[in-house]
Amino acid sequence: LNGIVFISQALDYQGSTPYVRDNLISFITYVPTMAATALYHGRVEPAPESQAVFLQQAREFAINEYLPALFKGNTIDREEYLAVRNRLSYFTGLSTNYVDRANLRVQGNRFTKELLRDEGITVGRLDSRYTEEVVDQLKGSHFRVLNVASDADFAELRRAKQETYS
């Protein structure tokens, strides 16, 4: 064993997973990653002057505005809801319509499908720089994606297969 590579924030599974019922913290922890992904794919408008400043603003928004809004639940007033929705839409690159439908609760697995939906592609879950065409699971051909697999590894396997069988 030469080392260990940790994938995701699974070191604090209880605190970071959206699969624990009513875990509001999970939505907060994903905002900076979603913001970086949206910025990388050119979905943040207007585009910020600095990536570092933008990501710091996303972190501050998540803690200072988004978290309190989620804790308020259905007692949040309309003005605050709209302000948070608009900022969340800006940082994530998602439409305000989608953020409304999600009731301000954008899950990571849905984000990967929604960000580039208009282009017919999904974003990698383990490395969001990679993309893949959306697979229709009803067609039965979804095994090639496997959560856009281990994105870089999957791309490498395709390259190696071409070299081997060419």
Where are these regions (language model features)?
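A catalytic-pocket lid/entrance helix-loop region that shapes and gates access to the active site
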Residues: 2-96
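Alpha/beta-hydrolase fold catalytic core
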Residues: 73-166
